[in-house]
């Protein structure tokens, strides 16, 4: 569960390292974002000499959360960290690589390009 002011890692090579959520996109009354939801975030830490700079406002899709997620088959999955992948206006990833495992729920949210870049889909 990601809400405003939540810090998360970045799971791609766009240059950002840490994000802080400032808005959960969707309807006005959404408080939390889960896996596959799009957020608006600010870059808190960035790698020098990369396109994404510190204090830049970016859109990102949630790839991993520490909050457990129940699946329809009864299994539960949870990750060690909160992580997001930065995206552009067309919902394509800004980076060319994705790091770490990605939840299968992104496939249902039409983020197939992120799924194809991921080394492992759980």
UniProtKB/Swiss-Prot annotation:
GO cellular component entries: cytosolic large ribosomal subunit; plastid
List localization entries: Plastid
Q: Which Pfam families match?
A: Ribosomal_L14 (PF00238)
UniProt keywords, alphabetically: Plastid, Ribonucleoprotein, Ribosomal protein, RNA-binding, rRNA-binding
**Chief location:** plastid
Question: What Gene3D superfamilies would the database entry show?
Answer: Ribosomal protein L14 (2.40.150.20)
> Which InterPro entries does its entry note?
Ribosomal_uL14 (IPR000218), Ribosomal_uL14_bac-type (IPR005745), Ribosomal_uL14_sf (IPR036853)
Question: Which biological process annotations from GO are given for this protein?
Answer: translation
Q: Name one GO molecular function term.
A: large ribosomal subunit rRNA binding
Classification via NCBIfam families:
rplN_bact (TIGR01067)
What family does the entry list?
Belongs to the universal ribosomal protein uL14 family.
- Which HAMAP family does the record associate with it? Ribosomal_uL14
Purpose of the protein: Binds to 23S rRNA.
Q: Which proteins does it associate with, and in what oligomeric form? A: Part of the 50S ribosomal subunit.
Q: What is this protein called?
A: Large ribosomal subunit protein uL14c
State the species of origin.
Aneura mirabilis (Parasitic liverwort)
Q: Which gene encodes it?
A: rpl14
């Amino acid at each position: 569960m990601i809400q405003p002011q939540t810090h998360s890692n970045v799971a791609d090579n766009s240059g950002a390292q840490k994000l802080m959520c400032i808005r959960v996109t969707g309807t006005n009354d959404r408080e939390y974002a889960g896996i596959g939801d799009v957020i608006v975030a600010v870059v808190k830490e960035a790698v020098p000499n990369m396109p994404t700079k510190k204090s830049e406002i970016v859109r990102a899709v949630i790839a991993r959360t520490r909050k457990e997620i129940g699946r329809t088959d009864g299994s539960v999955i949870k990750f060690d960290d909160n992580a997001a992948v930065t995206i552009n206006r067309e919902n394509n990833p800004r980076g060319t690589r994705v790091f770490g495992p990605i939840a299968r729920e992104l496939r249902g949210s039409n983020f197939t390009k992120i799924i194809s870049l991921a080394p492992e889909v759980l």
